[in-house]
Amino acid sequence: MDIISIVLLVLLVVLVVAFIFYAQNIKKNKQDAESLFNEAENKANEVMANAKREAESLKMEAEAFKKEARYTLREEEQKQRREIEDEFKQERQELKETEKRLKQREEILDRKDDTLTKKEENLDSKEENLVRKTDTLSKREEQLAHIEEKKRLELERISNLSTDDAREIILSETRDGLTKEMAQIIRQSEEKAQVEADKRAKNIISLAIQRVSSDSVAEQTVSVVNLPDDGMKGRIIGREGRNIRTFEALTGIDVIIDDTPEAVVLSGFDPIRREIARMTLEQLVQDGRIHPARIEELVEKNRKALDHKMREYGEQAAFEVGAHNLHPDLMKIMGRLHFRTSYGQNVLDHSVEVAHIAGNLAGEMGENVALAKRAGFLHDIGKALDHEVEGSHVEIGTELARKYKENPIVINTIASHHGDTEPLSNIAVLVAAADALSAARPGARRESIENYIKRLKDLEAISTSFEGVETAFALQAGREIRVMVKPEKLTDDQIVILARDVKNRIEDEMDYPGNIKITVIRETRAIDYAK
């Protein structure tokens, strides 16, 4: 709808409104009608003017929109044209590249085709050669089969053996060889397992020992009693020696009175009787009344006092290792071990040490620690009575454990710790190991210097008795022997055999505690001088 139509429509509406108004108010005066008509005409003119202005504005906007639309369409057209041209150029470039790749591939295929053609020719040539060689091999196989048959017949004739007999001999030799190989493999596996077991055992033992700290004082077979003056020696001897005879008869201990100033020596191998004698003599010296009746009185008194002291020693040791609910009599018997020695080592201290080591070993092995300590504590209880009751200390200790209803594992441990019976539990084995460790610890026990020196000399003598040995040195208190050999006489393989021969001689000819390490050293030196 254009502007003119709108204007005409507005005029028509105004005329209709005026006519209606005029018709309704026809009776009004003409002046009012004219006024209204003029007013309507003015409004119509105003509307017409506004309509014209709006029409002009719309026309201008339409023209501007038209121009803008044309410009936009032109730009869009140019943009699309450029995009189409770019796409066309890109496609043309891709086509060129594709054409180039196809050309290159075609060249490669041509080269491969030439190569395949050459290979086919080579294969054909090789196939012909193979056919010729196959024919030749077939002929040679026939010849070899004929020759083998002749050789087989000739061998059967010479050896008087059939093919089956020869096969059986070969199989037998093969079986023997395989058996040797299997034995070697088994031996190597056993050696490897032994090395691993030794390594693990050393680790466990080192862990167990490093957690045990105990004092060890070498026990003596004599006791020394100090005197206030040398005049006391005559009073101890008494008139015609009656005091000293009574003293020695009641205590069983030798009283040695010599030129040592202000001292008397009590000598005896029973530590209990020696302790009673020491206590009695000290009290006699302190009291000053020395006569047979007084000696007898004090000996009996000190014997009872020592019984009480031994029970205290046993209770203290049992408490230290955690051996609870131990029978009172067993505690007293264990206390007697405080006055017993084995190779100079206090047996009660040794029992406590064995209990601690066995407990540590049991802890590392996952065994019952308390039971291991109890078994280790009681393992040498028989030594408290072995000089009073017939039988070995193992037998006496086993009977005591049975009498006081100890655990069967403890009984078996006591019975087997020296190998007299078979150990029936891991704890028995651990206690035996702990016993050996405590006894073999450097400084724990002593032996005579003569035996020690003799053992070292015997070790060196056995080692140097073999041909090719230059010298030998016994080290670590006889626990290791190092053998130096002459390199021009023995090879590296021969020194392995020498080490084994030395080991066998030592095992056959010597008695020794623990193990002895044999190290054979072969040293070759090449010396020259730069001038």
UniProtKB/Swiss-Prot annotation:
Q: Name one GO biological process term.
A: mRNA catabolic process
State the UniProt keywords alphabetically.
Cell membrane, Endonuclease, Hydrolase, Membrane, Nuclease, RNA-binding, Transmembrane, Transmembrane helix
Domain KH spans what residues?
Answer: 221-281
One GO MF annotation is:
RNA endonuclease activity
InterPro entries from the entry?
A: HD/PDEase_dom, HD_domain, HDIG_dom, KH_dom, KH_dom_type_1, KH_dom_type_1_sf, Ribonuclease_Y, RNase_Y_N
- Transmembrane stretches, start-end: 3-23
**Entries under PROSITE patterns matching the protein:** HD, KH_TYPE_1
Domain HD span(s) in chain numbering: 347-440
Does the record carry Transmembrane helix as a key word? yes
Q: One GO term of the cellular component aspect? A: plasma membrane
Q: Where in the cell is it found?
A: Cell membrane
Name the EC number(s): 3.1.-.-
Q: How does it sit in the membrane?
A: Single-pass membrane protein
Q: According to its UniProt record, which protein family does this protein belong to?
A: Belongs to the RNase Y family.
Any idea what job this protein has? Endoribonuclease that initiates mRNA decay.
* HAMAP family assigned to the protein according to its UniProt record, in alphabetical order: RNase_Y
**Listed name of the protein:** Ribonuclease Y
- According to its UniProt entry, this protein's organism is Lactococcus lactis subsp. lactis (strain IL1403)
Gene name of the encoded protein:
rny
